[in-house]
């Protein structure tokens, strides 16, 4: 029940709410994307996977500029979504035919909200992405989401991706995740949740230690190349393992000091 210009009363058999509102004229108007904006259709499940598998490694530090966003590259034969937080890089590539479009950067928090929208929708149809010079629109069924694009130059991520490896390990994803979760119980937060991984032959040993005690986990793996001993922040590894669906995953190492 509307009361006066901007107030509303909501009544039930046993409750009554009085809500003070504001004039609808104060609500921000949705920005209009140019008529000549580029358009792209993408399967809903593909877009969900792209966001889910990259969103976790975008920076949450607003002082890092565009690193709080995710880069979307739309190439002739594929589309890629990239996030970087200064410690991790996530790149998701999906093969699909497109027109070559300009790269765009969208805030990771915005993409997280888009992921919620896609996950809650039971509409099984493609998502339309309309890209303007400063704004983008995401259209799904009767829902329209207006997004302000971020300005700035994204980090040249290809220059810092490992280009070769001396050790390759294949391992059951769930077993590895469970072992790291147990090892991380003793990983010291002040030491960046450090765990030590040693690959010797086809045996992976995971160790962690703190003032409260120590943990040792062993897993059988398939190894190619050199033996290696390397330390990791357990949280960073778990973040990756939790968004993957594969039963078996491959991890490549260059040496004990280089990223994997």
Which residues does each predicted region cover?
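Structural preference for solvent-exposed beta-strand-turn elements
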Residues: 1-260
């Amino acid at each position: 029940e509307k009361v006066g210009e901007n107030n509303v009363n909501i009544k039930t058999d046993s409750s009554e709410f009085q809500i003070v509102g504001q004039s609808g004229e104060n609500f921000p108007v949705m920005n209009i994307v140019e008529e000549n904006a580029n358009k792209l259709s993408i399967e809903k499940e593909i877009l969900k996977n792209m966001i889910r598998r990259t969103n976790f490694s975008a920076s949450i530090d607003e002082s890092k500029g565009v690193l709080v966003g995710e880069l979307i590259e739309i190439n002739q034969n594929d589309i890629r979504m990239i996030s970087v937080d200064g410690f991790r890089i996530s790149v998701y590539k999906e093969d699909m035919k497109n027109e070559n479009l300009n790269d765009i950067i969208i805030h990771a928090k915005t993409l997280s909200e888009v992921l919620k929208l896609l996950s809650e929708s039971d509409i099984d149809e493609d998502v339309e992405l309309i890209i303007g010079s400063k704004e983008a629109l995401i259209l799904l069924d009767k829902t329209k989401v207006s997004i302000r694009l971020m300005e700035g130059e994204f980090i040249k991520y290809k220059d810092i991706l490992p280009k070769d490896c001396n050790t390759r390990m294949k391992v059951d994803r769930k077993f590895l995740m469970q072992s790291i979760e147990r090892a991380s119980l003793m990983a010291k937060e002040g030491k960046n949740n450090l765990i030590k991984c040693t690959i010797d032959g086809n045996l992976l040993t995971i160790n962690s230690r703190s003032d409260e005690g120590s943990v040792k986990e062993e897993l059988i793996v398939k190894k190619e190349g050199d033996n290696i001993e390397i330390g990791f922040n357990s949280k960073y590894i778990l973040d990756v393992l939790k968004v993957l669906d594969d039963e078996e995953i491959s991890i490549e190492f260059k040496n004990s000091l280089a990223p994997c």
